Curated annotation (Swiss-Prot):
Species in which this protein is naturally found: Wigglesworthia glossinidia brevipalpis
Quaternary structure annotation from Swiss-Prot or TrEMBL: Part of the 30S ribosomal subunit. Contacts proteins S5 and S12.
Pfam families assigned: Ribosomal_S8
PANTHER family to which the protein is assigned, alphabetical: 40S RIBOSOMAL PROTEIN S15A
Protein name: Small ribosomal subunit protein uS8
Superkingdom of origin: Bacteria
Annotated gene: rpsH
Keywords: Ribonucleoprotein, Ribosomal protein, RNA-binding, rRNA-binding
Any single Gene Ontology cellular-component annotation: ribonucleoprotein complex
GO molecular function annotations of the record: rRNA binding; structural constituent of ribosome
Length: 130
């Protein structure tokens, strides 16, 4: 069976890994997933990620915990294949009054809502991370 929405699969793997207190989770590799993992690392939501290139490339994420609680309290998919959500720069969401991030796919690549506002860009809202 083919995977219909790989980003939702990635988000679900992160959620399940954190609820099971896993330190390392793995998933099939794609450039989009790598970009999202890079943003999560830059914003301090995960410790690190690496790409293992065997027969099938794999993306491995090192999850981050603080006082035995996951750093990512909530991660939610917004735009999905059945219902794409696009926002202009003025209408980009402010997640948790700036404490969380929205990951946005823009014409300049994948970036946070804060960075998209500085570049005056809108785009597709991929997910919220709190």
């Amino acid at each position: 069976m083919s995977m219909q929405d790989p980003i939702s699969d990635m988000i679900t793997r992160i959620r399940n890994g954190q609820s099971a207190k896993k330190e390392l989770i793995s998933m099939p590799y794609s450039n989009l997933k790598k970009s999202i993992a890079n943003l999560l690392k830059e914003e301090g939501f995960i410790l690190d990620y690496k790409v293992e290139d065997n027969k099938k490339p794999t993306l491995k994420l090192n999850l981050k915990y603080f006082k035995n609680n996951p750093v990512i309290e909530k991660i939610k998919r917004i735009s999905r294949p059945g219902l794409r959500i696009y926002k202009k720069r003025k209408h980009l969401p402010n997640v948790m009054s700036g404490m969380g991030i929205a990951i946005v796919s823009t014409s300049r690549g994948i970036m946070t809502d804060k960075l998209a506002r500085t570049y005056n860009l809108g785009g597709e809202i991929i997910c919220y991370v709190e």
